[in-house]
């Protein structure tokens, strides 16, 4: 493979920029296809956001420089970062998709360029004037091979490129990278977890060839099982001495583990079991001398799944009901588990939790809102944030709950203005009927918000005819 070189500047220096698909899509919005080969446009960019140029700009660019692919100009003195062949893999992020050629425009009188050394990612360059050339797909193993051939430091950035390949399910790239001799230092469990998540049998076999010991093999069985990957599970069972295909259970797996090895990856397995909703495995791991963190993770899992018995078990064994700033109550509200909300409050959690009340109001969880109010939640706390959330999202019944329990809707025009702004005419009608004045709403006469209220008045939506409700 050979990358095209374009001679845009006297120095003929090429760099590389790793970009996401979103970045390229923004570029494509500005592309104007004049023929099959050249994409010509002049773009101004700010913070990596690209704006489509006019046809006049395109014609001017085409007439002045018919060899250009894409010319980019940075607004003001802002700089765009890029790198070189050696460090290109150090710039990878999970959403990276392409590598673009970058040619600094050294002959531009406003050209600026910086060079920054980063111990983790290698050398980074920044410039405000440059051309972009070809784009190359990182998922193409031939592109990866080419970069390595051109001097990419695979030893320094191996973890970065291999992690990217796993996260983006680029099997061919992963298999090629496994061929390097220094791979034996890789975290086998981390790689194994990703393989089991994806159900990739090819990579599982390749991992075996690169140091798949008996302990890792046994973990692989349970990880494939809790990841719902029967193809991998059945493959691993054919290589295990202690499992029967028809009887994959936690106790069976436990019996096969060499003494002491269960603790090695216990927390990681626990988190995977929680993520995949395997209550049996969660409960078993909690009997294996769990750390405080393990117990609290399991407690939060019990709340999100409304598992009362598991919640009781975790609390009995040291779980902290207030872990991570009362996350248990927040999760119970988020997942609309009224039974968990009741239980947690009975266990001593503060019902006057503004964030919990606001979240319940925002998501129209009426039973939870009523229960929190009944247990003493302040409906006017934090500048009436819960009330405003209900109004903003158009939840009339919850607004009525708040008003019936003392919410202050007349202290200023925030509540009715929010209802107007979001077009909730039923709430506007209700508020006006409750005596909220619209005289003091400070909005321009041509405002759509103002028009909504005016329309409400014209159509006799107001329940009472108090002068304070009229708009002149």
UniProtKB/Swiss-Prot annotation:
Taxonomy, superkingdom: Viruses
Keywords: ANK repeat, Repeat
Gene3D superfamilies: Ankyrin repeat-containing domain
Family matches, as Pfam families: Ank_2
InterPro entries attached to this UniProt entry: Ankyrin_rpt, Ankyrin_rpt-contain_sf
Mapped ANK repeat ranges: 125-156, 187-216, 265-295, 297-323, 325-351, 352-381, 382-411, 413-440
PANTHER family, per the entry: ANKYRIN REPEAT PROTEIN, GH09064P
Protein known as: Putative ankyrin repeat protein L675
Species: Acanthamoeba polyphaga mimivirus (APMV)
Lineage: Viruses, Varidnaviria, Bamfordvirae, Nucleocytoviricota, Megaviricetes
């Amino acid at each position: 493979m050979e990358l095209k070189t374009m001679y845009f500047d006297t120095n003929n220096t090429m760099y590389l920029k790793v970009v996401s698909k979103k970045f390229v899509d923004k570029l494509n919005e500005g592309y104007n296809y004049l023929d099959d080969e050249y994409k010509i446009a002049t773009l101004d960019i700010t913070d990596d956001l690209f704006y489509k140029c006019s046809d006049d700009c395109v014609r001017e660019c085409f007439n002045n420089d018919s060899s250009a692919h894409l010319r980019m100009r940075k607004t003001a003195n802002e700089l765009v970062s890029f790198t070189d062949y050696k460090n290109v893999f150090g710039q990878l992020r999970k959403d990276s998709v392409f590598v673009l050629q970058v040619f600094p425009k050294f002959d531009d009188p406003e050209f600026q360029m910086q060079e920054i050394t980063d111990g983790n990612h290698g050398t980074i360059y920044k410039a405000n004037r440059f051309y972009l050339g070809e784009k190359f797909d990182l998922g193409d193993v031939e592109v990866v091979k080419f970069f390595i051939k051109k001097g990419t430091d695979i030893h320094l950035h191996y973890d970065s490129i291999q992690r990217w390949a796993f996260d983006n399910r680029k099997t061919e790239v992963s298999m090629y990278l496994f061929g390097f001799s220094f791979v034996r230092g890789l975290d086998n469990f981390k790689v194994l977890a990703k393989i089991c998540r994806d159900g990739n049998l090819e990579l599982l076999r390749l991992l075996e060839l690169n140091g798949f010991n008996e302990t890792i093999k046994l973990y692989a069985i349970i990880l494939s099982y809790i990841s719902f990957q029967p193809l991998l599970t059945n493959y691993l069972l054919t290589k295990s001495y202690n499992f029967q295909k028809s009887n994959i259970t936690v106790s069976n797996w436990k019996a096969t583990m060499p003494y002491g090895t269960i603790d090695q990856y216990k927390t990681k397995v626990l988190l995977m079991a929680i993520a995949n909703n395997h209550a049996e495995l969660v409960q078993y791991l909690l009997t294996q001398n769990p750390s405080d963190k393990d117990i609290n993770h399991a407690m939060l899992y019990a709340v999100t799944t409304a598992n009362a018995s598991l919640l009781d078990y975790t609390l009995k064994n040291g779980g902290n009901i207030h872990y991570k700033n009362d996350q248990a109550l927040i999760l119970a509200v988020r997942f609309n588990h009224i039974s968990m909300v009741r239980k947690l409050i009975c266990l001593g959690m503060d019902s006057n939790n503004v964030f919990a009340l606001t979240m319940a109001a925002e998501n129209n969880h009426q039973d939870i809102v009523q229960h929190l109010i009944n247990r003493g939640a302040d409906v006017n706390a934090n500048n009436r944030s819960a009330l405003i959330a209900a109004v903003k999202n158009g939840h009339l019944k919850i607004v009525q709950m708040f008003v019936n329990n003392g919410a202050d809707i007349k202290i200023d025009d925030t509540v009715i203005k929010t209802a107007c702004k979001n077009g909730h005419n039923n709430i506007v009608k209700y508020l006006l009927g409750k005596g909220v004045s619209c005289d003091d709403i400070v909005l321009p006469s041509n405002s759509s918000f103002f028009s909504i209220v005016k329309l409400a008045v014209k159509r006799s939506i107001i329940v009472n005819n108090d002068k304070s409700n009229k708009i002149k």
